[in-house]
Amino acid sequence: MNKKFIFILLIVFICFLNISQSIRINNNKNNNINNNYNNNNNNNIQTKEKRERNLIKFKEIEKIRKFLGNVESLTTIPLVSNEKIILEKLYSDWNGKDWDDNTNWLNGDPCMNQWYGIECNSFDGGITNNVISIKMSLNNIVGEMSTEIKNLVHLQTLDISNNGFYGEIPIGIFQQMNNLSYISLNENEFQGDLEWASYLPDSIVTLWIAMNQFQGTIPTFFSKYPILDLLFLEENLLIGTIPPEVGDLKKIKLLDFGLNTITGTLPSSIGNLSYLEQFWLYDNQLEGSIPLTMGNLQNLKLFEVTRNQLGGDLSGVFLNNPNLKSLRFSGNSFYGDLDWICQLDGLRDVHFDINRFESLPNCLGKAPLQMNELLLADNLISGTIPSSIGNMIGIEYINLARNNLTGTIPSSFNNFSNLNRIDISSNKFNCSLSEILDPIKHQTHLTIISAQYNEIHGEFFENMVWDGVQQIELLTKIFIINLSHNKLSGPIPEYLSWMPNLNDLDLSYNNLSGTVPNQLSFLSTMYLENNPFLGSSDGSLPLFMEPSVIFIHKDTESYACPSIIGKGFDIRISLDSTYYNNSFCLCDYNYRGVNGSCKICPQDSYCPGGGNDILIPSGYYPMPSNENPEYLLKCIISNFGYTSCNPDSSYNYTCQDGYQGRLCSKCVDGYFHKGTECSVCPTGPQSIVIFIVVVVVFIALFLFFVMTDPKRSLPSSTRKTVMYYYQVFNLLLSKLSPWPSFFSIFYSGSSWLNFSFGFLCINNLSRWPNLFIVMICLPFAFLVISIVFIASMQLFHYVKSSLNGVDYIFNKKLIYSGVRVNLLALNFLYLPLCIYIFQNYPCTKDQVTGESFMSFFPWQECGDNSTHNRIMRLTIAFTIIYVIGIPLLFAILLFYNRKRLDNPMILTMIGSIYIDYRKSVYWYELVALGRRFFMAVSLALIDPKSSFSIFVVLLVIGSSIISQIIFKPYVYRISNYSETIGNSVLLFSYVCILILSSLATTKLYDSQGIEIILSVVVVVYTVLLLLLFLFSLKYFLPKKWQTVIDYHIIKFITWVRITSNNLISDIKDINSIDGDDSFETTKEPIFERTVSNNLNVLGSFELKRRNSQINSNCNNNNNNNNNNNNNNNNNNNNNNNNINNNIISAKQLDCNNNNNNYNGEKITPGDGQDCLISLSIDNSGTNFNHNNDNNNNDDNNDNNINNNEEFNKNN
């Protein structure tokens, strides 16, 4: 029963191996179709070789097992009791409950109840049995070799292979088993050396200990076992050389040392193994050549030394081995002639691939007719295939791949009766396809043709698959055809479908054309890529194909295409995307396009891939067009951080409403430029009203400055401070960003000070270059208007005098006033003129196209452009006329008239240039023009965001503050203070904008705090300027009103001073310290009180008022003086009546009193006087003094602590 059961298991196992082998061969065939000979293929080949070896070895082992199984097992006789105990102990030690099969174990008697894997027999005919066999291979046994097993002394067979045993095998454990002939420990994890094997009984026949972790060298003691015929040591960790004592294994039939690390050479003593049939030495590190004594092995059938380092010429080595069937020398360095194999009649397998052979065997006479496999791939074979190869009629598989063969396949290949597979890939066959297929097309068993990587050319013909003479189909068993990487041309014919068993077709990397026929839908694998002329004109796929959802990306492409699969069929298809015009392909991320035409997304843009979509981020402009952008240009950021370029960051790129042109920088119709922004033009009645208001304001200002005397005008110093501050502040607002949105109010309100009249939207006058032309014409317009007005006024007076009969007197004052007005206009226009002129110079070069465009008008091209050239000629001309001419004109006027500045005529004409400054710095207006010039250079001629521009701006504003502190140029103290504070505010604002710009770029910190501080500082200074402006308006009022205003101002200031003094006194008392503990301190001048030389009072202050008439004479007439004295007395009486809270109010005093503490010197007309009212405040009395400062010496005025300069002299 057990014998039959074991026999059936063996038959099933052999069938399983054969089936697995067949499947593996097919798999290897499929895998090798599209791959070069590489490491992966080597692994597959090694796996295949291993299975083949195991099958061969298993056949030899079966002979032993059948011999050992001839003894009948007496199941009716119980087992000796002590052996049952041993088996139970083994069950416990080896954790029997976890075995895959523990049938009947521990139930009754092992022999009678047939415990799984146990065989029994009686040797003495007694009433008890003994255990003679343990066969528990593949039973999931885990543990060490138990020493209990040594007591089973009657054991003949021990097979515990393919389990989980580990550890070392105890020495002597098998020594007492005198009948032990078969040991199989393979495929476990046993360790240690092989010393235990020296204590085996002499009865040992088979020792299979392969695929463990045994270490050390090959022992020499195996020769002491007289009947050992099978020795398996493969796949361990053995090292060293093959000892010569191996030659003493007289009965050995199979010797397997494969897959170790054995070195050295093959000992010649191997020739003594007369019974040796199989010798396995694969995958070691053996060197040298094959010893000639191998010819002594008359019974040798198989010899394998695959993948070693052996070499040499094999001629004459195996001529005396008549039974030799298989020679496996792959992966070595053998060379020489191969004709000697023709003498080996029984040779079936020749595996000589990966060596250094240079020619094929030429068996002209005798040939091995039983040859099945001839493998000579990866050698150095050249020339043509000899026709004598066809004499080996039994060949089933011929592999000549990866050599240097040329020519064609000889017609003698038709002699092969069982040809199954042919591989001539990676050679240099340069024949037609017909010359390759015709010699083999009648092979009825042929399944695989591999001819890739050659130079085969030509087309497919019908006679390749159809025999018209015999009217039969050819190549009906063909399963795989690989003709890739050749030069095939023409269409793929539909008659390839006449090969019914064709499964895999590889025609890739050829020059095929046309379309794929729908008749090939039955294939399982189809490789057709890299056929440049293969494709459909309409971009469609064959009916049996469709794109899958899996996209494949090539390293050299910027798009991914779907893999093509069978429509309703399981077909693996490799087809170029050009076949369907890339219509199913999608661009990669960061690329855009359709149908495989994908361009890289321009820098700073975003392309999601999969189509032509591109997202141009806000603030960038696509070039050369929105539809096909190749690169992006950074757009101008508006003054308040906005951008006109794609503000919504949408895929549909648009400029913001009101913008157009390059960089979205040009205003469309109905919009005007306000800095870098385009604002909507006022329309309807609103535009008319704005225009009328502007015209009326400018006419009123013109008439005011022409008709009024300079002493009656708004104090010039205040006007200049306001104009300079707001002109520069507006320039910063227009050229820098990002300003807080709050400042848009300041920008709109101050634009007109820089003559930005674009908001008028009069036709195209608000656009460049028209606005530039209007600007440079303004000074001439003022001149023409002045001339026309003065001429009209002179004509009016002439006609009036004529009608009244009075002689006409030419009024020179009007001409003087006209000159003064035009100089005033040039002064105020200088900064705007510089800005408009300098903006035309800078051009920015496009780094991609090389074209240049104006930096401040990016839509206008520089260079070869008629408009730009005309404007540049005007710009250069007016740079000389205005930018250089105005300061030069002012300098000439000042230095030419420097000794006549007190002259009434000079004062009337050019007084606006110097009247506001102290006499010692009468030239300071040139400094003011210089700082305007450099501000315009730094923000209009140079890129406002460049480091050089930053340096110039900081230098200009900083030097302005320093010069203001040093020179104190203005006559009025408050003007000096306001000018210094204004420059400080400009400096602070500029620094804040630099910080805000940096924060906007890095986005590391919040900018809200800086925005709030900046807004507060600018608003506070604006309020201060407004108060100063309102204060200066009192000079347009009657003198009585001015006196009342002065009184209230004096009263308020006095209250503030008294309050502050009391507070300071209290603080000093609180903060007083003991003198012994204090350090000596130095009183800082900045906190010292300024006291008038003429006053010795508790507190004092000064109030200057300019005389009302510039041409009035100070009368020396005593009567007039007396009258004036009387007036003064009356005024004093009135003052006494108005004294309140010990505060004395200054009433109107006539500065012409020569008898009232005056020196009585005659004052010539035009000597303008300032009446200095020095008020002494005493809480205990009502005393006061009136002192008139008539000193004309400017240096004395500078030394006066009250700084009562002769401001009137400049008037």
UniProtKB/Swiss-Prot annotation:
The keyword Transmembrane applies. It holds the Pfam family LRR_1. LRR repeats lie at residues 154-176, 179-201, 203-225, 227-249, 251-273, 275-297, 299-321, 323-345, 346-367, 370-392, 394-415, 418-440, 445-465, 477-499, 501-524. The keyword Metal-binding does not apply. One of its GO terms (cellular component) is membrane. GO terms for molecular function: protein kinase activity. The chain crosses the membrane at residues 2-22, 688-708, 728-750, 771-791, 818-838, 876-896, 920-942, 947-967, 980-1000, 1012-1032. Gene3D superfamilies: Ribonuclease Inhibitor (3.80.10.10). It is found in: Membrane. GO terms for biological process: regulation of innate immune response. InterPro entries: Leu-rich_rpt, Leu-rich_rpt_typical-subtyp, LRR_dom_sf, Plant_receptor-like_S/T_kinase. Residues 1109-1141, 1183-1211 are annotated as: Disordered. This is Putative leucine-rich repeat-containing protein DDB_G0281931. It comes from Dictyostelium discoideum (Social amoeba).
